[in-house]
């Protein structure tokens, strides 16, 4: 059996390495799934993020035909503020808009994880509350100018410069970064029990 991470996120790669089982020869390969991330008009934020994680895992499985008995992990993270889904910004103005919305507010970060081998599929959803301090226009401009927000849900990275804006967090820090470690370990353990 071989573990495959269906992601191009360097943060997920780093986090998955942390989730390794010390008593096993745990390593993983990377594949880059390409899925349509457009929300469906009828789905909730929870349904949306769970669907994306599952579709990434399934697309990763399709890309893993060269791997013997692949176990493919897909994950997705969104930021939700008052029912509004904030994905990755499309440009700098979009990043500034998102950060202005998050300023002084508490939002929810949802990270879904799905693991499949084609026969068995397991998934988890992790919800974390994050409160931001008030951000000035200068704060937002400087942060967006750093380039950091451009590939991150909600236009911030808690593990880097964006962490300076976080007043408090209730829930999983690693889920906000992009991969909830406790839930991921649970999925890996479930899969190992079923194979």
Curated annotation (Swiss-Prot):
EC number, as in UniProt: 3.6.1.9
Record-linked Pfam families: Maf (PF02545)
Origin superkingdom: Bacteria
Purpose: Nucleoside triphosphate pyrophosphatase that hydrolyzes dTTP and UTP. May have a dual role in cell division arrest and in preventing the incorporation of modified nucleotides into cellular nucleic acids.
Keywords: Cytoplasm, Hydrolase, Nucleotide metabolism
PANTHER family membership: BIFUNCTIONAL DTTP/UTP PYROPHOSPHATASE/METHYLTRANSFERASE PROTEIN-RELATED, BIFUNCTIONAL DTTP_UTP PYROPHOSPHATASE_METHYLTRANSFERASE PROTEIN-RELATED
GO biological process, one term: nucleotide metabolic process
Active-site residues, record numbering mapped to chain: 76
GO CC, alphabetical: cytoplasm
Family: Belongs to the Maf family. YhdE subfamily.
Keyword Hydrolase set for record: yes
Keyword Hydrolase: yes
Protein name in UniProt: dTTP/UTP pyrophosphatase
Protein localization: Cytoplasm
Molecular functions per Gene Ontology: dTTP diphosphatase activity; UTP diphosphatase activity
Cofactors (names): a divalent metal cation
UniProt catalytic activity: dTTP + H2O = dTMP + diphosphate + H(+); UTP + H2O = UMP + diphosphate + H(+)
Positions marked as site (Important for substrate specificity): 11, 77, 159
